[in-house]
């Protein structure tokens, strides 16, 4: 049996791999062929020799679940309760897959919004009142002097400016690529080089605006993904602590 070509670095977790295999085999997420998916998934596990053990354990847990479901499919059903347990286990796995797919889609949406945020512009000020047009063909400029015409123009210009809906005009300077994830990544790497443990709140305190805070947080997530640091909290809403990984220090 031919297995699809798999690159370890392409996937962020076991459910990301499962979604890839389901799409690769053109399966419906609500009707997955567990036997076929399990074989391909186990081949992927065999290629994880150089992966971090903490990450590998997540894949192994899902692999064990797939093997158990597959074995129950192959074995004869003795009791009705066993059949129901098998269905519940498979249903639970599918529900987790669907939830992960929704979260991944939402994350991609917000990422696109962030990337395109620097390309948004507001429309020009609108005139609140409509100009009343008449069918009067009378030459209103007849017998007007040049000075009177000039004064009339200034009066109309003043009326126009006063009727602009300036309250809804966003006065904002847009900085294109002022804050880059690559730059923040270098800054954070230098920070953890000199400190055993750093507080994320201290990094945020030095940010000039909300956009810089967001870029700093994305850079931190990238460092976690690259296995450069560990992040943890003592409790919910406590300070996020950043610690350099020991294996990275040895390198």
From Swiss-Prot:
It is found in: Cytoplasm. GO terms for cellular component: cytoplasm. Keywords: Cell cycle, Cell division, Chromosome partition, Cytoplasm. This is Segregation and condensation protein A. Belongs to the ScpA family. GO terms for biological process: cell division; chromosome segregation; DNA replication. The gene is scpA. Its main location: cytoplasm. The lineage of its organism: Bacteria, Bacillati, Bacillota, Clostridia, Eubacteriales. Participates in chromosomal partition during cell division. May act via the formation of a condensin-like complex containing Smc and ScpB that pull DNA away from mid-cell into both cell halves. Transmembrane segments: none annotated.
């Amino acid at each position: 049996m031919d297995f699809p070509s798999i690159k370890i670095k392409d996937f962020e977790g076991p459910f990301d791999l499962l979604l890839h295999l389901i799409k690769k085999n053109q399966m419906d997420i609500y009707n997955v062929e567990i036997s076929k998916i399990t074989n391909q998934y186990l081949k992927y596990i065999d290629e994880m020799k150089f992966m971090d053990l903490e990450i590998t354990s997540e894949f192994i847990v899902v692999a064990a679940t797939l093997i158990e479901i597959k074995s129950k499919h192959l074995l004869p059903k003795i009791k009705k309760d066993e059949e129901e347990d098998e269905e519940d286990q498979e249903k639970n796995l599918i529900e987790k897959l669907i939830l992960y797919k929704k979260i991944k889609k939402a994350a991609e949406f917000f990422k696109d919004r962030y990337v395109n945020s620097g390309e948004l512009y507001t429309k020009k000020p609108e005139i609140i009142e409509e100009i009343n047009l008449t069918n009067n063909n009378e030459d209103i400029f007849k017998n007007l002097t040049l000075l009177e015409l000039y004064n009339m123009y200034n009066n109309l210009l003043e009326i126009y400016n006063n009727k602009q809906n300036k309250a809804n005009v966003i006065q904002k300077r847009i900085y294109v690529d002022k804050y880059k994830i690559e730059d923040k990544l270098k800054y954070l790497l230098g920070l953890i080089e000199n400190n055993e443990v750093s507080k994320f709140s201290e990094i945020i305190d030095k940010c000039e605006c909300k956009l810089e805070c967001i870029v700093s947080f994305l850079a931190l997530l990238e460092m976690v993904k690259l296995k450069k640091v560990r992040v943890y909290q003592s409790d919910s809403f406590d300070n996020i602590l950043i610690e350099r990984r020991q294996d990275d220090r040895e390198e």
